[in-house]
Amino acid sequence: MTKYTFKPKDFKAFNVEGLDARMEALNEYIRPQLHELGEYFSDFFTSQTGETFYPHVAKHARRSVNPPKDTWVAFATNKRGYKMLPHFQIGMFEDQLFVMFGIMHEAKDKATRAKVFERNFKAIQQLPDDYRVCLDHMKPDKPFIKDLTDDDLKEAIQRAINVKKGEFFIARAITPQDKRLKSDKAFIAFLEETFDQFLPFYSA
């Protein structure tokens, strides 16, 4: 019995038709692990940074018609919410498990906060080859950093700084069949390794 990880069939919750039925599927197959990951990694971030982190599991409460295409747990230092702060996320679409750190378009002082990525441009480029960027958290697209030109990356960061709807996340994503999802031990190791790469950007 696993506590933290997800099986390929869990991702099929996103194929269930209808809002109520999909929410039931998420509650059964995905949210229990997100809550466990929330507890584990809020402690992890608190111990790594010396700041108190809180987990925020997506509730999808505002939805009245369209079922969610993704779900997540986010980590931030505000107990009431995470969108206004730089934050970490573990989440899922039907075809990927993603891990991210960055800034949403709703962030307070977004232009100032996003400059951490401008200042640490070289460090972004030096992340391992399987690291990506996400420029819109509502879409699954996450191009590999290694496939972006310097200008592409600079433009993406500038958009987060200067455009109201601009966002910037560094990210990592794996498929539902990935071997790192086969056990809790492998999954937690993958997540800790990823967050260890993200944390310097949080502290910078």
UniProtKB/Swiss-Prot annotation:
Transmembrane annotation, as ranges: none
Pfam families from the UniProt entry: DUF1054 (PF06335)
Listed InterPro entries: UPF0637, UPF0637_domain_sf
Similarity annotation: Belongs to the UPF0637 family.
Protein name: UPF0637 protein SAS1041
Native organism: Staphylococcus aureus (strain MSSA476)
Higher taxonomy: Bacteria, Bacillati, Bacillota, Bacilli, Bacillales
